[in-house]
């Protein structure tokens, strides 16, 4: 019973720490007309680069883990 209680407490602590991290990463958008669709191109550029880098990493990892067997 004691191990179960310690496990639950640890799980709750981990979940709470993850919630705090996600709150810290949240960024309020500046009020420069965003609600009217007036974003500058630089605001999209950083997200695109990040997404592209993540896709490249995932592609390389998948190719290493699951090699393709092509029949010729």
From Swiss-Prot:
| Tissue distribution of the protein | Expressed in corpora cardiaca (CC), corpora allata (CA), antennal lobe (AL) and gnathal ganglion (GNG) (at protein level). Expression detected in only a few animals (at protein level).
Modification sites for Phenylalanine amide: 36
Record keywords: Secreted included? yes
What are the subcellular locations of this protein? Secreted
- The answer to whether UniProt assigns keyword Signal to this entry is yes
Chief subcellular location equals secreted
Propeptide residue numbers?
40-72
Q: Where is the secretion signal located? A: 1-24
What keywords appear on the UniProt entry? Answer: Amidation, Cleavage on pair of basic residues, Neuropeptide, Secreted, Signal
Q: What biological process terms from GO does the record include?
A: neuropeptide signaling pathway
One GO cellular component term of this record is: extracellular region
Family note? Belongs to the FARP (FMRFamide related peptide) family.
> Per its record, how is this protein called by name?
Neuropeptide IMFamide
Q: Which organism is it from?
A: Agrotis ipsilon (Black cutworm moth)
